[in-house]
Swiss-Prot record:
The lineage of its organism: Bacteria, Bacillati, Actinomycetota, Actinomycetes, Mycobacteriales. It is an enzyme of class 3 (hydrolase). SMART domains: UDG, UreE_C. Keywords: Cytoplasm, DNA damage, DNA repair, Hydrolase. This is Uracil-DNA glycosylase. Belongs to the uracil-DNA glycosylase (UDG) superfamily. UNG family. It is found in: Cytoplasm. Excises uracil residues from the DNA which can arise as a result of misincorporation of dUMP residues by DNA polymerase or due to deamination of cytosine. GO terms for cellular component: cytoplasm. It comes from Mycobacteroides abscessus (strain ATCC 19977 / DSM 44196 / CCUG 20993 / CIP 104536 / JCM 13569 / NCTC 13031 / TMC 1543 / L948). GO terms for biological process: base-excision repair, AP site formation via deaminated base removal.
Length: 226
């Protein structure tokens, strides 16, 4: 991740919203450069670390929270659960998300695992921890990213604009108090193969999110993926 000012790396709305933690973002950049210089490296690539914040803050209407990036080199691309279009096969958690997408919406299975069209629709795909050491899941937890992403979530809530949060798994569920009573939430177990059969399948998160958005007076999301 480059040492450029935050305003050059993210959407202007997000640059303002993350102003209180700009110094923390700088510290995280220093941490990542140390990871590289030590030979440990990090994922996703530097240009994609803040990718979730390059889409307009003002447009966000659904928040989907992930834990941390995929640790497999070539998979993480800066949006939670998403992978680059050329990744085959898709990670199993994403495959389960696609199974539920098909069941819930009656749409065909997407051709690839790139969820960028959702981001362009105002769906924020945010990992609580924005980086990971290759091959080492959760290796950057507690290093400081949580300060940044919790500031982001508070900024979303403070807008007083329609917002629905989709919380998959225990880690995401701990954010519910931060969202407050005004943000409707859709909760289930994580789509991981270890838990998906215990309540993720059949939870209909996509159609339910649209029902809640309409109830808030907002436009529903067009969830279709190519």
């Amino acid at each position: 991740m480059t040492a450029r000012p935050l305003a050059e790396l993210v959407d202007p709305g997000w640059a303002d919203a993350l102003g209180p933690v700009a110094d923390q973002v700088t510290k995280m950049g220093e941490f990542l450069r140390e990871e590289n210089s030590s030979g440990r490296g990090y994922l996703p690539s530097g240009a994609n670390v803040l990718r979730a914040f390059t889409y307009p803050l003002a447009d966000v209407r659904v928040l989907i929270v992930g834990q941390d990036p995929y640790p497999t080199p070539g998979h993480a691309m800066g949006l939670s659960f998403s992978v680059a279009a050329d990744v085959r096969p898709v990670p199993r958690s994403l495959g389960n998300i696609f199974d539920e997408y098909q069941s819930d919406l009656g749409l065909p299975k997407p051709a690839n695992g790139d969820l960028t069209p959702w981001s362009e629709q105002g769906v924020m795909l945010l990992n609580r921890v924005l980086t990971v050491r290759p091959g080492n899941p959760a290796s950057h937890r507690g290093k400081g990213w949580e300060i940044v992403t919790e500031c982001a979530i508070r900024a979303l809530v403070a807008r007083d604009a329609p917002l629905v949060a989709i919380l998959w798994g225990r880690d995401a569920a701990t954010l519910k108090p931060m969202l407050g009573p005004s943000v409707p939430t859709i909760e289930s177990v994580h789509p991981s193969p270890l838990s998906a059969s215990r309540g993720f399948f059949g939870s209909k998160p996509f159609s339910r999110a649209n029902e809640l958005l309409v109830g808030l007076g907002a436009q529903p999301v067009d969830w279709r993926l190519p």
